[in-house]
A protein has these predicted regions:
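His/Glu-based metal-binding/catalytic segments typifying zinc-dependent metallopeptidases
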Residues: 84, 88-96, 173-238, 322-343, ...
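Short, conserved secondary-structure transition motifs
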Residues: 69-75, 86, 90, 178-197, ...
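M16/MPP (pitrilysin/insulinase) zinc-metallopeptidase core fold and M16-derived inactive scaffolds
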Residues: 1-45, 51, 62, 92, ...
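Extended, domain-scale alpha-helical bundle/helix-rich regions
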Residues: 360-400
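Scaffold signal of the M16-like zinc-metallopeptidase fold and its non-catalytic homologs
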Residues: 44-48, 52-59, 74-141, 160-164, ...
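A glycine-rich, aromatic-flanked flexible loop/lid motif
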Residues: 198, 254-263, 286, 471-474, ...
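M16/insulysin-pitrilysin zinc metalloprotease superfamily fold
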Residues: 34-79, 263-319, 334-342, 359, ...
């Protein structure tokens, strides 16, 4: 109404300093969250969001673009639409097919029965009139929930809600979720999912699911969280242990534990990498474990350990991905939507007090397992089996449907379709009047980049002075401790190096086997981790800055996590053969199942693999070829003892080299706790058992790949990428290249690839680690045409008149992402890692300053130099 533009959401992303903007659709709610640190920006976004939500212009041509339409190609009808293609891509993932097919049976009648994103085979049935009717019924204040977090008062905000949107409405109908009709006996079903190729062995999923009572019962909700912890928290937990070691599956499944986000709770457990004939063994095995656990009291120390995890999770201030306030809002949203009190979800102290009272009865948790799992008839077992013909059948069904439509089309119908297609193209080509929308400008950008400052201390590690990076932060009673180890060059390039991080904390250490170590971690820490922080050198693309990170966190009264981290690394055990093979098998299976969601990342990685030392290393160690290598390795070590022994020898060599390598420490905590924690770290790490003998690593021959490649994965859409050699991040041209990527995305690629091409997403990016400039598309129905659009975007920049606001918008988005706040601990850890990789505060501020001063001439110059002249 107030902002009659075609796409207020994408246009406001560019005209804002937002730290988060998105829209989420669930089975019984849709949310429109946004966040910003700038008050003017908040007012702008609030006014546009309220106008879009409550006074939407639902243009039938926009429905055709975003939802579904028919166009004619060579005189024959074809389906097009952004969401249609998005859901084709989303439903390619086996985990999505598993969830939606299971929900279909677990919820026979309620809204959860349906795929809220839209099943691709049903989307063509949706009409514009149905969309408008749905909007009128649901998008009414009587059916809305407003949640805010920040320093504006509730009164002030409510006044704005009223003034900007709500005053024009009268009372409407409030919609309520309904309880599901309960099954009177368990159900067993078999469904299929699409796979490529004829090899169907070890590709079946088994899952058991139960429908539980309403999530509004806060005590039961926490009780079932404890049940989940007892059964599934770690590899020593009885149900997870059974599923990981059952012998008929390669890994636990993607659906595990309690889901309390719906009106009624559910409990899941399952396996993947299995075969159909094991369905009965799976069901009987799970039920036997549940019977064994429910038959006796649960060890109180185990319950205390799970309560420790709940307290740790409750205390932790996150916000490194989604802003902290929005995380809280989204956690409480399902409660509020279902007319419950979200404060009970955020503040679990009262629920913990109630639960502790119930725990006076040693059989309380055991009885919950008996009542809500064993004696609960609303149970669905699903066997999801691979079908190599399913994709072809779905495509044939779509073709047959379109052919039937085509046969009935009269010349008049065809003329109408052509006219609508032309009208949509004209609408897409007509620039919006941006003056209608509010904006912030470069004058609203903070003058300086906020960077957390730490202290550099020294402690004794292995009788040597060793740096300790200390950061004081408001961590709400939690400390974060890390060991940072400079990774030798031969180690970082070894494909075996990544395997070591899979083992750390998951195999035994010292006198503890892996089951004992798992339980210890749950009792005293938020887990133990090993990872790698890798960057290209700021001024040399042929060198890698590489640090190993050993990580833990815990409540400040639990120092044992510091001891446990050292033990798990220093005395990591390589003698648990079955466990090690099991962990590598799990990694391979989970990696395979996640491919279709990250196709654009793999495409960009492949395209830029030879443009820096780090790009080459990442492609060889984490790319699609590395997945094939891991699969072959798992097969070899399972069948051949000598191959297994060779693997362990290699891992031991890498472990020794890392023990020998130079170290630093990182501690993030509240100031009043720091001296005790520093002292404890020194006491623990003073003596380190290091084998000083030199070790040599095996050189693994890497294949020399082609310049142009296509990889086939199981999906009904494409992920396209082109890459061009660019410069190191310290080069003055890095800033213009960053702005160029945003400029081309906003000004050309979004329209060409998403709006006109029908892909769910697309754009460009400069990658300072790969030292490359990359174009990409995501869930894209096209192929060759998209590559032409990549090239056309450069010609558009060089050969058409450009508008000044486009440059400002591109710079604004980049600066907003640089200035985006994290959690208190996350900002400290980021600052420390930046220093390790020579991204000093001066370096970061210089880059930001360069971004703010990029000109249109700079963009045209770097586009010619890097995207045309080297082609």
């Amino acid at each position: 109404e107030k902002f009659p533009v075609r796409d207020p959401f994408f246009l406001m992303i560019r005209r804002s300093l937002n730290t988060f903007m998105n829209a989420f659709t669930a089975a019984d709610w849709t949310a429109y969250p946004f966040a910003t640190q700038n008050k003017k920006d908040f007012q702008n976004l609030l006014s546009v969001y309220l106008d879009a939500a409550f006074s939407a212009n639902l243009n039938p041509l926009d429905f055709a673009q975003e939802g579904i339409r028919i166009e004619l190609e060579n005189g024959q009808p074809v389906y097009k639409g952004v969401v249609f293609n998005e859901m084709k891509g989303a439903m390619s993932a086996p985990s999505d097919q598993l969830y939606h097919q299971l929900a279909h049976h677990l919820f026979p009648e309620t809204t959860y029965h349906y795929n809220s994103g839209g099943d691709p085979k049903d989307i063509p049935d949706l009409t514009y009139e149905q969309l408008v009717e749905f909007y009128k019924t649901h998008y009414h204040p009587s059916n809305a929930v407003f949640m805010t977090f920040g320093n504006q008062t509730a009164y002030e905000l409510q006044e704005q809600f009223e003034k900007l949107a709500l005053h024009k409405f009268t009372a409407g109908t409030t919609l309520y979720s309904k309880p599901e009709k309960r099954l009177t006996a368990p159900v067993e079903v078999t469904e299929t999912y699409a796979v490529d190729g004829d090899e169907l062995k070890d590709k079946t999923y088994h899952v058991l699911s139960w429908l539980l009572p309403q999530a509004s019962d806060i005590k039961l909700r926490l009780g079932m969280r404890l049940v989940e912890g007892v059964l599934l928290e770690n590899s020593a937990s009885p149900l997870r242990h059974y599923l990981e070691t059952c012998g008929y599956a390669q890994s636990t499944g993607p659906l595990m534990g309690v889901d309390d986000s719906n009106f009624e709770m559910t409990f899941y457990c399952g396996v993947q990498g299995s075969n159909p004939e094991h369905a009965e063994s799976f069901r009987d095995g799970v039920l036997n474990v549940l019977r064994e656990v429910a038959a006796k009291p649960i060890d109180s120390s185990l319950v205390d350990a799970i309560l420790h995890q709940i307290e740790l999770h409750q205390r932790e201030i996150n916000g490194d991905g989604t802003p902290y306030g929005l995380s809280l809002i989204l956690n409480g949203l399902s409660g509020a939507i279902h007319h419950n009190d979200p404060i009970q979800i955020w503040d679990v102290d009262s629920a913990i007090a109630q639960v502790k009272e119930e725990l006076q009865d040693p059989m309380w948790l055991s009885n919950l397992i008996q009542t809500h799992l064993l004696d609960n008839p609303h149970r669905v077992q699903m066997t999801l089996v691979p079908d190599a013909t399913k994709s072809a059948k779905e495509q044939e069904a779509e073709k047959a449907r379109l052919a039937a439509i085509g046969e009935k089309l009269t010349e008049e119908d065809k003329a109408e379709i052509i006219a609508k297609t032309k009208a949509l193209q004209e609408r897409q080509d007509t620039p919006d009047n941006l003056e209608l929308l509010p904006k912030v400008g470069l004058e609203d950008v903070p003058a300086d980049l906020h960077i957390v400052q730490g202290q550099l201390r020294e402690i004794i590690c292995n009788r040597m002075d060793t740096p300790l990076n200390l950061y004081h932060a408001g961590t709400n009673g939690i400390y974060y401790q890390q060991v940072l180890i400079q990774i030798p060059d031969d180690v970082v390039k070894s494909p075996y190096f990544n395997l070591l991080s899979i083992l750390m904390g998951e195999v035994g250490a010292g006198e503890y086997d892996y089951l004992e170590l798992q339980n210890l971690q749950t009792a005293v820490s938020g887990g133990l981790g090993m990872g790698a922080s890798l960057r290209s050198k700021v001024d040399d693309k042929d060198k890698i800055s590489a640090w190993l990170t050993l990580t833990t966190k815990s409540l400040t009264q639990k120092f044992d996590a510091i001891h446990l981290l050292k033990l798990a690394f220093e005395q990591l055990r390589f003698d648990e053969k079955e466990r090690i093979i099991e962990l590598l098998q799990q990694r391979k299976t989970r990696w395979q199942s996640r491919l279709s969601g990250a196709g654009h990342s793999y495409a960009m990685q492949i395209a830029s693999r030879n443009m820096s030392a780090l790009a080459q290393r990442d492609y060889q160690n984490t790319g699609l070829g590395a997945l094939n290598w891991l699969g072959e390795l798992v097969t070899k070590i399972t069948q051949d003892d000598a191959a297994y022994d060779a693997l362990i020898a290699e891992l031991k060599h890498i472990h020794t080299k890392l023990l020998q390598a130079p170290k630093q420490f990182l501690l993030v905590c509240e100031e009043h706790q720091s001296e005790r924690l520093v002292e404890e770290i020194q006491n623990v790490w003073d003596k380190l058992n290091v084998d000083t003998a030199a070790t040599e690593l095996t050189q693994v021959e890497q294949e020399n790949d082609n310049e142009h490649e296509a990889w086939l994965i199981q999906t009904n859409v494409q992920f396209c990428a082109s890459a061009y050699q660019a410069v190191e991040v310290s080069h003055p041209d890095a800033a213009p290249l960053m702005v160029l990527a945003a400029y081309l995305r906003n000004g050309f690629l979004h329209s060409a690839i998403r709006e006109k091409g029908g892909a769910y997403g697309g754009g460009a990016s400069y990658d300072g680690n790969a030292c490359s400039f990359r174009f990409f598309s995501y869930r894209d129905p096209r192929l060759a045409e998209t590559f032409k659009d990549f090239e056309a975007s450069v010609q558009w920049l060089l050969n058409t008149e450009q508008q000044p606001h486009q440059l400002e918008e591109a710079i604004l988005g980049l600066v907003a992402s640089m200035d985006k706040p994290g959690s208190p601990a996350g900002e400290a850890i980021t600052a420390c890692y930046a220093l390790l990789h020579a991204r000093t505060p001066t370096f970061r501020r210089t880059l930001r300053e360069r971004l703010l001063h990029v000109t249109l001439e700079d963009l045209q110059r770097v586009a010619r130099q890097y995207l045309i002249e080297q082609t």
